[in-house]
Amino acid sequence: MDALIARGAHVRVVDDLSSGRLENIQAHVNSGRVSFIEADLREPGVARSAMKDIQVVFHLAADHGGRGYVDLHQAGPASNLFLDGLVFWEAIKAGVEKVVYASSGCVYPNSMQTDTAREIYLKEQDVKPPHDADNMYGWAKLMAELTLQAYHKEYELGAASCRYFTVYGPRGVENHAVIAMIARAFVGQNPFEIWGDGQQIRNWTYVDDIVDGTILAAEKIQDGTAVNLGTMERVRVIDAAKLTLEFAGRKADFKFLRQMPTGPANRVADNSLAKKLLGWEPKVMFREGLRRTMDWYFADRKPEQVKERLETMLTAR
């Protein structure tokens, strides 16, 4: 939102505020640069009216949470099949020039992500039959990518899909791993809980880099090509937790909750296609991004309020 406004765009936002916070964009709404519609895009007529006179649609709406939500609530993410199809069809009917879709690393085969001993980087061409996506959330994202490509071919709808890898940063919520770790450090949790054995590998990608890549995709991709937006920095969960505690100035023992959802063991993007097509590469590595995110989180909350709601927040939307 901030980046689009800085580029001079006039923006219309649709959000049912089931997980978002209006205060994040309130200043832009007050300035008149953003028009806000509080509604569910799945309700009759909402998507059609929202897209009137719009040139580019950034479709980020989804029923989604973190790993706890994705694993424990399959029906919710499955409903994204309907949501995505509706948005794409109404974009065509409204004469929208391009749809930029927020896809996910969850489209990649589970079978490629099981061994932490392998230094593997997921490439766009790895998504191919026989498909093996991650949960209903991943299957819905995959089908949306394929639908957009088909709509480009048949209806000449401009399209691009951005496969986001473990996004984090200010304005994030506690059901995602990095914010969850920050919340645990913030309230002084001891023992400090980690889902799984802590050896899972991720390439956490800072939100500002994701925003830049998404806008570049809108500018440079037309045919529905999907690109990875993620760092190639390999970070173990246990190391991220240790760094979080270090930045918070706290010490704690670790308690590994091996029965909790953990996702794939080894998920890291190859971002060479984004570099080639978009001229994009991440600027904020994990250490700096974590520090920025912790500064934001610690300044905005009271420990007693977070502690009271933490367990619910970890698995909710």
Where are these regions (language model features)?
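Short alpha-helical
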Residues: 20, 65, 172, 235-236
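N-terminal Rossmann-like NAD(P)+-binding domain of SDR-like oxidoreductases, especially those catalyzing
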Residues: 1-167, 284, 299-300, 306-317
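NAD(P)-dependent short-chain dehydrogenase/reductase
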Residues: 111-121, 142, 146-219, 232-234, ...
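C-terminal substrate-binding subdomain of Rossmann-fold SDR/epimerase-dehydratase oxidoreductases
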Residues: 3, 186-317
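Generic recognition of short, well-ordered alpha-helical segments
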Residues: 23, 48-49, 72, 82, ...
